[in-house]
Regions:
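N-terminal secretory signal peptides
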Residues: 1-14, 21-29
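Extracytosolic ligand-binding ectodomains
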Residues: 2-4, 17, 34-410
Length: 410
């Protein structure tokens, strides 16, 4: 690693070291637990998230969810099966570049004795880092969406969120159900998606669901991540005659798309593909234009307020889905370590496959628990539909878990 220095940051409950390198503002931030009595060796968990670049806010949210649970576990006695061993988070910035993420993963594995790695939000980043962790036989647990993540026969990858194609299909099917419940019939839709692993895979699920329902796709438009003007996309949308639009975008693009739609007085329902559509910055960036925007999501904070309210109190914003998923992932990982009675990566991998993890933060997932099959997919994960209502994100579908009925404007 190019010349680095160690910076010690103190807080009320922990002291953190941040190793700052030349390519990333934050290369590592392990928890260091100090007390007056001997401790069992700490269990090192790698956290590789995009803490800078286009996806930085998502990475920060993921890190916050992980730190929140790690702090709670450490404060209540650590990992019991290992004599109260504390969790030591080794945090690195993946930036938003897959090549950089891969290099950082190699460095982290070389320089630390790790039990597992959590990362890296964006599917393209996770695809890169999981190739490295597979070669090292270290479990990689992720909340990324792309189907390919658990479709490569890697024994060490675990995907807590639904696959993108499942999310895309639910995004479409839930929308049709909501519109029909409101007495509206959709015959034409538009799909616009960023041409990344996430956007491409999710659009595939949307496309197949529309075909199965005999709904005409009158616009099917990929675009490069990081647009600074959505005028052309929205002009095509207006000309298409679509009755609903399904945009798949990260934060900046989602704001451009919805703002341009509303400024051009295009009032058809917009149903986002999670990502940029379900974090507080979306509403902050759009104000009143965010009201009633729908989105698919792997989970939502209002499904587990007894758990998520304390996150809001600490961090000052509602617990977004990526924070919840990473909290549930770390909780499940710690349960696996407890059952394995070992922090050895291979022992943990064996337990993760096929075991059911219940209680704690796993209850915050719509499936009520987490269970990974032999491919590493969480088979209990079920998407939900959320909607922006008065600056809050509310679960509106399916009816069995809805906190309020959806608002539909055809």
């Amino acid at each position: 690693m190019p010349g680095h220095k160690t910076v010690t940051i103190a807080s009320a409950s922990t002291r953190r070291r941040a190793i700052v390198g030349g390519t990333a503002a934050l290369i590592a931030a392990p928890f260091v637990v100090r007390s007056g009595f001997a401790q069992s060796p700490a269990v090192n968990i790698g956290v590789i998230q995009p803490l800078s670049g286009a996806n930085a806010q998502f990475g920060i949210n993921c890190r916050n969810g992980i730190e929140f649970v790690a702090d709670a576990i450490n404060a209540t006695g650590g990992i019991k099966a290992l004599g109260g061993a504390k969790i030591n988070l080794v945090v690195s910035d993946a930036t938003s570049n897959p090549s950089t993420a891969s290099t950082i993963t190699e460095q982290m594995i070389t320089q630390n004795e790790l039990t597992a790695i959590l990362g890296a939000f964006a599917s393209s980043l996770t695809l890169a880092i999981s190739e490295v962790t597979a070669r090292a036989d270290i479990p990689c647990l992720t909340n990324s969406f792309a189907d390919e993540i658990t479709g490569r026969s890697l024994e060490s990858i675990f995907q807590v969120a639904p696959k993108a194609s499942v999310i895309g299909r639910a995004q479409f099917n839930y929308t049709i159900a909501i519109s029909e419940a409101a007495g509206s019939k959709i015959e034409k839709i538009a799909i616009m998606y960023e041409d990344t692993a996430y956007g491409t895979a999710t659009s595939r699920g949307l496309r197949r669901a529309a075909k199965d329902a005999n709904i005409e796709i009158v616009m099917d438009e990929p675009y490069p991540l990081g647009i600074n003007d959505a005028t052309l996309l929205i002009s095509k949308l207006r000309a298409s005659g679509a009755q609903a639009v399904f945009p798949l975008s990260y934060l900046n693009d989602s704001i451009f798309i919805i703002r341009t739609m509303r400024q051009q007085r295009i009032a058809i329902p917009a149903i986002g593909g999670a990502a940029g559509y379900v974090i507080p910055d979306f509403e902050k960036g759009l104000g009143e234009f965010a009201e009633n925007v729908l989105s698919i999501s792997p989970t939502n904070y209002d499904l587990a307020l007894a758990l998520t309210d304390s996150f809001r109190q600490r961090f000052g914003y509602f617990m977004v889905h990526e924070a919840i998923e990473n909290a549930a992932t770390l909780d499940g990982l710690v349960q696996a370590i407890e059952r394995a009675k070992s922090a050895k990566p291979k022992a943990v991998i064996e337990v993760l496959h096929g075991a059911r993890f219940e209680g704690g933060w796993t209850k915050a997932m719509p499936g009520g628990a987490v269970q990974f099959d032999q491919t590493g997919l969480n088979t209990l994960s079920v998407p939900i539909m959320v909607q922006w209502r008065n600056k809050e994100l509310v679960t509106v579908w399916p009816k069995a878990v809805a906190k309020a009925p959806p608002v539909w404007h055809s």
